[in-house]
Amino acid sequence: MAGALVRKAADYVRSKDFRDYLMSTHFWGPVANWGLPIAAINDMKKSPEIISGRMTFALCCYSLTFMRFAYKVQPRNWLLFACHVTNEVAQLIQGGRLINYEMSKRPSA
């Protein structure tokens, strides 16, 4: 059973359909876009004082907009959708870190 599954996957990878997919914007667009969530995830190790609230908000709006686009476009671009879901989560975490940092700077009453 596993051998048949591996053979089927290998046949698909060698197919013209797969090569066409690799040469399309449905593949390379999301690959290039993965830089945003990777950078956000990498920045989680850094101090929250470097987080830009405006940029975080803009990237949240951007990812929400393009999540919808990736879902609505035909054929659906699941790679782009996954990229924007990951970026949305990463940006929301960064936004939460910024809010916690700003709240901790305020003097308690």
UniProtKB/Swiss-Prot annotation:
The modification N6-acetyllysine is found at K72. This is Mitochondrial pyruvate carrier 1. Its main location: mitochondrion. Residues 2-20, 72-109 are mitochondrial matrix. Homodimer. Forms heterodimer with MPC2. The heterodimer is the more stable and dominant form. Mediates the uptake of pyruvate into mitochondria. The keyword Kinase does not apply. GO terms for biological process: cellular response to leukemia inhibitory factor; mitochondrial pyruvate transmembrane transport; pyruvate decarboxylation to acetyl-CoA. InterPro entries: MPC. The gene is Mpc1. Keywords: Acetylation, Membrane, Mitochondrion, Mitochondrion inner membrane, Transmembrane, Transmembrane helix, Transport. It catalyses: pyruvate(out) + H(+)(out) = pyruvate(in) + H(+)(in). GO terms for molecular function: pyruvate transmembrane transporter activity.
